[in-house]
Amino acid sequence: MINETVLLDAGTVGIALRLDEQKRIRHVLLSHLHHDHIQGLPTLADNLADDIDDPVALTSIPQVLKGLQTYVFNDTIYPDFLKLPDPQHPVFVCRALEIGRESEVDGLRVTAIPVNHLVPTVGFLIR
């Protein structure tokens, strides 16, 4: 957790944070799609699905967000929490960041910086 509402990657969110802490999350900054960085998202979604007012923003570069839609939340591996519990009130929404451009994320200034890795990956400059 960066603060009480912004999470950096989601590897262990479902087991490392208490349910009341998970319910405060409004944004998840995702660096890349490797399993150890996203494996907690389905558990987080399941924990929030029945008691969520506003969706949690999954925030990253377009390649990461597209990969989540194609390979993770595809109703084959996991339910599509980008459309559940219903399309008008999903658990998650995707928010794309442009590399090198500063964006506001819940009061923080976040810039995605490219990182040399095996898959499309960014680090985050957070102010």
Predicted regions mapped to residue ranges:
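Binuclear metal-dependent hydrolase catalytic cores
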Residues: 1-127
